[in-house]
Amino acid sequence: MHAPQWLGAEGETIAAKYLAAQGYRILDRNYRFHRNEIDIIALDGGVLCFIEVKTRTSIGKGHPAESVTPRKQKEIIRAATGYLAGLDDPWVTCRFDVIAVLAGSLDERSIREYEIEHLKAAFIVADEG
């Protein structure tokens, strides 16, 4: 059985609330650059964080963070590059995080219980030069 379509958006809302409670300043959600998207862009002190959120109802097909494949990482990096190009000072310290939300129980259109795991610096930009 596939998870409801609203599950991803609900997981992103949970992640944004979690980050705000941890002192992060949310700058943008669902930022799009061409066909690439970043779920959450936030400031952690002076560090600009590009955050991918993965929500699952079980770990039957692996940990949610495992679905952030090298291809998905490249898409996030492309979107981050577009975001940075629009800043007055694009030479800020950046970090790429993944937040995994494992939903324990669901209501009609919400997640009632969940576990959350924040993987800071989950991947880095490799020089392909």
Curated annotation (Swiss-Prot):
InterPro entries: Restrct_endonuc-II-like, tRNA_endonuc-like_dom_sf, UPF0102_YraN-like. One of its GO terms (molecular function) is nucleic acid binding. Pfam families: UPF0102 (PF02021). Coiled coil: none annotated. Belongs to the UPF0102 family. This is UPF0102 protein Cpar_0015. It comes from Chlorobaculum parvum (strain DSM 263 / NCIMB 8327). The lineage of its organism: Bacteria, Pseudomonadati, Chlorobiota, Chlorobiia, Chlorobiales.
